[in-house]
């Protein structure tokens, strides 16, 4: 009895906490805690209710979904309650859901249940009612019983039909409103301060001025029809498409649980390629009649469960903001964090981007911050928990001199980045420039790791790029005996000197890239090399560009920013001296290019699936030689998708974006010279 009384007190405490956070999340669109922390509160509450079933009868709060509607909007009653879903956090939870479902439907264990597997969009749930084919009312989910009337705002959403043909006289559809990540970034760049895309979508829908909502580029996906005549969820989604609604393309139907788990893993591993936030996979019993038999609990349907992804966000303490100097002199602030597990990866550092980002989010050393990790993207700080901030924490002061060399810093026009003026006097810049110079896509000198470069620099054996090619001579004439130092032996030294000598014959493209000129990446270096063909022609044209104010370049795909960077680089005497010293040690080969006549010259292409004629890396080289730019991600700017065997999700995405799809054979033809 005493245990139950203690449990009741803990349950009341949890209910108050959850209710508080529901208001912040569903009404104010300003959550204080992460989704993972909220899920943990709900998990603790469910543990108590499962251990003490009698408390369920007095726990009225569990019947509520979300929070009461905002009083700024008219209240709307849902004729059919809008439920939330139960969550699963591992495969065992999903398997238990399958077992419960089979038991409820009197299905044998050896029989399977077809499931509709759909993405769980991290947005705002909404309902739209049509009367006689015309949009009548739209509302939020609210607490499940009552929502907010958002009809005027919802009508501003692009691609939402205002009139539907061949529909029942009374039709209610439900879905999720969201905002793309790229539109979210632009929204914050325009002066807003939303913590994440979900908050941005919810806040935009709840604007009192629908003209503001119209500017926010909201999108939606529909996922259900209330009281549908369809026989399956698969048929239901198809019917929504027929009526003109946006329906998510990443959906499969399967009666194989392993295939359902594989779908989860595929989406989880590739979610960074999807331009909107998803936080799990929803498994629904595909048969609508079975859904009706299963029914609902007070809070959620028994015929569906949301298998949540591991938290992509987590809260931890920011211990220090350090400044990293790159090879171009950019001062990049880095957050040094208390170690935190995010999606199975231990994160200790996160990007803070620039000075403006720190000031906009008011990030301070000692703060507790929300860290987000998506795919292979560098972890980023998306928000600060200011409720946990103590009074002694002061605003971060961005350095006015370079932390590495003490040189003054400056902010370039129309840029957020701050630069060190030290250049060749800045240790960090020099080391980063040398590291870039010896990298795989530049001189490709194997044996020059970060530790080795730092050692040679501290021994004053390599203080600039040219020193690499006199290293062997310097060592033989110095008192430093590498053989006596840890990590160096006769063989490792011989291998290093051999790699340096082998690198002395280099293509013009790799040479240009190796110089580390601002805005000159691998692709631009290839365009310049193809255009000028020889080192002598390129160098002389660069001198003209730097010395003659009226002289400019007219090269396809080379913009004014890049030309300005070339002009600045070749205007500096120390850069010219460095190049002239370098070429004394090198043989720079001319570019043999026939790419101008290729049908994919100047095009952006993406590969998907397995190629039968060559490896992916060989295909990349072939395409780039033909003048194309090979990208790993698909967007509306992509010109061609090259589809091999067993193409992935990019194939469907290309169709939706109207990107032209080429077979492997056709791509091979396109890479040929059109003169042949």
From Swiss-Prot:
InterPro entries: BRCT_dom, BRCT_dom_sf, DisA/LigA_HHH, DNA_ligase, DNAligase_adenylation, DNAligase_N, NA-bd_OB-fold, NAD_DNA_ligase_OB. GO terms for molecular function: DNA ligase (NAD+) activity; metal ion binding. Gene3D superfamilies: 5' to 3' exonuclease, C-terminal subdomain, 6.20.10.30, BRCT domain, DNA ligase/mRNA capping enzyme, Helix hairpin bin, Nucleic acid-binding proteins. CDD domains: BRCT_DNA_ligase_like, LIGANc. GO terms for cellular component: cytosol. The keyword Lipid biosynthesis does not apply. DNA ligase that catalyzes the formation of phosphodiester linkages between 5'-phosphoryl and 3'-hydroxyl groups in double-stranded DNA using NAD as a coenzyme and as the energy source for the reaction. It is essential for DNA replication and repair of damaged DNA. NCBIfam families: dnlj (TIGR00575), PRK07956.1 (NF005932). This is DNA ligase. It comes from Ehrlichia chaffeensis (strain ATCC CRL-10679 / Arkansas).
């Amino acid at each position: 009895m005493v245990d139950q009384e203690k449990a009741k007190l803990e349950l009341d405490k949890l209910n108050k906490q959850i209710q508080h956070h529901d208001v912040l999340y569903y009404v104010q669109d300003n959550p204080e805690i992460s989704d993972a922390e909220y899920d943990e509160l709900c998990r603790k509450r469910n543990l108590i209710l499962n251990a003490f079933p009698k408390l369920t009868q007095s726990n009225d709060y569990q019947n509520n979904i979300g929070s009461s509607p905002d009083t700024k909007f008219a209240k709307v009653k849902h004729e059919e309650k809008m439920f939330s879903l139960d969550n699963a956090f591992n495969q065992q939870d999903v398997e238990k859901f399958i077992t419960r479902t089979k038991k409820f439907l009197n299905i044998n264990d050896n029989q399977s249940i077809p499931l509709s597997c759909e993405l769980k969009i991290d947005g705002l749930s909404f309902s739209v009612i049509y009367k006689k084919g015309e949009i009548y009312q739209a509302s939020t989910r609210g607490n499940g019983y009552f929502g907010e009337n958002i009809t005027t705002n919802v009508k501003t959403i692009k691609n939402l039909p205002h009139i539907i043909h061949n529909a029942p006289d009374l039709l209610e559809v439900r879905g999720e409103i969201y905002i793309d990540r790229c539109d979210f970034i632009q929204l914050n760049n325009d002066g807003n301060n939303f913590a994440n895309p979900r908050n941005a979508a919810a806040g935009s829908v709840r604007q009192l001025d629908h003209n503001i909502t119209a500017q926010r580029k909201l999108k939606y996906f529909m996922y259900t029809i209330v009281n549908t005549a369809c026989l399956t969820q698969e048929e239901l989604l198809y019917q929504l498409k027929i009526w003109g609604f946006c329906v998510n393309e990443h959906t499969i139907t399967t009666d194989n649980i392993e295939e359902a788990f594989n779908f989860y893993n595929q989406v989880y591993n590739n979610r960074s390629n999807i331009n909107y936030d998803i936080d799990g996979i929803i498994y629904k019993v595909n048969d609508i009649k079975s859904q009706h038999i299963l029914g609902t609990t007070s809070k959620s349907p028994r015929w569906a469960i949301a298998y949540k992804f591991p938290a992509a966000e987590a809260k931890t303490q920011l211990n220090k903001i350090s400044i990293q100097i790159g090879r171009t002199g950019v001062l990049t602030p880095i957050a040094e964090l208390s170690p935190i597990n995010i999606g199975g990866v231990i994160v200790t550092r996160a990007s803070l981007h620039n000075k403006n980002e720190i000031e906009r989010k008011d990030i301070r050393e000692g703060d507790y911050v929300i860290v987000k990790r998506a795919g292979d993207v560098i972890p980023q700080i998306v928000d600060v928990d200011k409720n946990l901030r103590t009074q002694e924490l002061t605003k971060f002061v961005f350095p006015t001199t370079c932390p590495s060399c003490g040189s003054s810093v400056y902010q370039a026009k129309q840029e957020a980045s701050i630069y060190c003026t030290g250049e060749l006097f800045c240790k960090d810049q020099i080391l980063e420039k040398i590291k870039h110079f010896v990298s795989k896509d530049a001189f490709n000198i194997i044996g020059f790791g970060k530790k080795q470069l730092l050692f040679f620099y501290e021994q004053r054996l390599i203080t600039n790029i040219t020193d690499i090619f006199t290293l062997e001579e310097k060592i033989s004439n110095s008192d430093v005996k590498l053989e006596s130092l840890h990590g160096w032996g006769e063989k490792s030294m011989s291998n290093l000197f051999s790699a340096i000598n082998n690198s002395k014959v280099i293509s013009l493209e790799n040479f240009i890239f190796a110089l580390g000129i601002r805005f000159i990446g691998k692709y631009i270096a290839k365009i310049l090399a193809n255009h000028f063909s020889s080192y002598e022609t390129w160098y002389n044209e660069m001198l003209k560009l730097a010395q003659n104010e009226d002289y400019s370049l007219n090269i396809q795909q080379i913009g004014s920013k890049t030309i300005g960077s070339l002009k600045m680089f070749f205007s500096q005497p120390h850069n010219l001296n460095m190049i002239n010293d370098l070429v004394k040690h090198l043989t720079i080969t001319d570019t043999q290019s026939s790419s101008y006549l290729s049908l994919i010259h100047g095009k952006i292409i993406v590969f998907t699936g397995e190629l039968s004629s060559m490896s992916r890396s060989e295909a990349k080289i072939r395409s780039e030689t033909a003048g194309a730019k090979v990208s790993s991600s698909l967007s509306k700017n992509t010109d061609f998708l090259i589809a091999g065997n067993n193409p992935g999700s990019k194939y469907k995405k290309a169709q939706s974006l109207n990107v032209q799809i080429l077979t492997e054979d056709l791509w091979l033809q396109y890479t040929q010279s059109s003169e042949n």
